[in-house]
From Swiss-Prot:
Protein name, per record: Uncharacterized protein ORF45
Chain residue ranges for the region called Disordered: 19-53
Organism: Ostreid herpesvirus 1 (isolate France) (OsHV-1)
Comp. bias regions, Polar residues: 30-39
Length: 241
């Protein structure tokens, strides 16, 4: 068996694509006609006999918003064929320098079965004054992919931890939204409501007398741990820097 396995990625940066894009942010188009494609092959370290193939498309949906879709599939040899696990990832960058982002990762049904599955949302580098924009951004972003159904009904509960980045001081609550306990996440539109509640609760709890960067860890964990059950953690990071 070969140990020098590589991952093959395709990046299609269509920031100047003239296609009209409706991702829940109002169908906006960008001017221009050029398209750049970059193909790269990178070593897959510490992975034996596996090949990851991914394709990424980036759209400049408006002056301040850029959406990247990544579709990936991991192939691993098994005795009578190849195991296939898919992943779909959405990243929405916010701001002129695109340093702020919401990232949504969806793992396909087969990977849910194999790895327990994970859905994550990352909100990074928003200022306190942007809390209204962040809530709207999360709503629009998750609504834009609500047609992607999650295959299973996930009962979830909420745990919240606020941490001051520099001092390490923590604020913890057992369950800030009791109505989320046992909440059934049927699809992404349902998840949208959950995330919005988490964002609102976070800003309500955020200390008003500190300029330190804050990090929010929010995990929705399946309540009944049964053999083969799926755990769905959702991670939301918030940084004021």
């Amino acid at each position: 068996m070969s140990r020098g396995v590589s991952s093959f990625s395709i990046h299609n940066d269509s920031a100047a694509d003239t296609k009209r894009i409706g991702y829940g942010m109002g169908e906006k188009s960008s001017a221009g006609s050029s398209r750049d494609q970059t193909y790269s092959v990178k070593p897959a370290s510490d992975v034996k006999d596996k090949k990851k193939v991914s394709e990424s498309h980036t759209f400049q949906v408006s002056e301040n918003y850029r959406l990247t879709q990544t579709f990936g599939r991991l192939y691993s040899p098994i005795p009578f064929g190849r195991e296939s696990r898919s992943k779909r990832e959405y990243t929405l960058d916010y701001g002129m320098n695109n340093k702020s982002a919401i990232k949504f990762v969806f793992h396909g049904k087969e990977e849910l079965k194999v790895n327990g599955g994970k859905v994550s949302v990352v909100v990074d580098k928003f200022k306190k004054s942007d809390k209204g924009a962040m809530d709207k951004l999360a709503q629009k972003f998750l609504t834009s992919i609500k047609k992607e159904k999650v295959e299973t009904l996930f009962p979830v509960s909420l745990k919240l931890r606020l941490k001051l980045k520099e001092s390490g001081e923590e604020y913890q609550t057992a369950n800030i939204n009791n109505n989320l306990s046992g909440h059934m996440v049927k699809d992404y539109s349902d998840l949208d409501k959950v995330v919005r509640q988490v964002l609102k609760s976070f800003f309500d709890l955020m200390p008003k007398d500190t300029d330190e960067g804050l990090v929010l860890f929010s995990e929705f964990i399946k309540q009944e741990a049964k053999p083969g059950s799926t755990i769905v953690p959702i991670l939301i990071d918030y940084d004021t820097e």
